[in-house]
Amino acid sequence: MRLTGVSRGSAWTGLSVTTTLPNPSTRPGLRLPGRVTLAADGGEDVLVRHIRLGLVAQVEPEDPGSPRRLVQYHQWPIAGRFVVPGGRRRAVDFAVPLPWETPVTVFGGVPLMTLRTGLRTEVSVEPDLDQGEMVPVLVHPLPTQQHLLAALDTLGFVMRQAGLQQGRLPRVAQTLPFQQRLGFWAAPLYAGPMTELEVIMLTDPAGMEVLFWLDRRLSLAGVTHQSISRFRVWHAGADRRDWVSTVDGWLRHAIDRHAAAAAHADWSATIRESAHVSRHPDQPVAPGYGLGGTAGGAGVGGGGGGGDGT
């Protein structure tokens, strides 16, 4: 697959910009290769001051009443001053490293609900600034992210929403100005202690920090109780881990903390069944099962102890 973004030719600068990604599919932390081609459409030479690339995405503001807005969350300079001769073309190749916290937009080969991210090219030509059309970037999960989401699917969680929330989390080593949040309806085994589960995944070169945000509606009037638990897992050895047992252990730990923080509530957090019998082993998880949700999209097949939790 090859994706291309082309800017409109600028009558002021006489320059058109084309950005091409030979393979738009990638993962957080990997390099994204491509080429920016500039064409001086008129007979005059064009002096280019710089070329920059930026990653952009739709982000939910901290004020829930405000609409989503397009945010450029990372930028790379790829070229300094040079001249494009009149009637000629100039190509600039690049291979830029994606941030480790780049939001995942594709899961199980399917777009993850409405989440999108794109690459935008900025060309500075005195005194104008040309921004080319955005080129979609298809960000697939890292193995640790893949295993986590597959385990949640195997345990019976159903995705209900996915988005990017502006702001920084306290006491978390966060590098981007937002977090990717994935919301799930609680699986039947865990539906007593909680109503909804929100998952935040923050990755770095060594591993992944996972935040489980539990929410339980305590009354028909809409009163809720929320709590957050944090866990850490390493990329090394991810394929050898029993992810269903790991995630089930995280959930039970989070539910215990959730119950302790809401000791006044008239409900019990005890879970007596095993996670491994919530779905019969003779019923494998088919690709696309479970992450259908109410907001669209489809998802993932099964996954398969430990991890530090707080």
Predicted regions and their residues:
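Short aromatic-acidic-glycine turn motif
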Residues: 55-69, 217-223
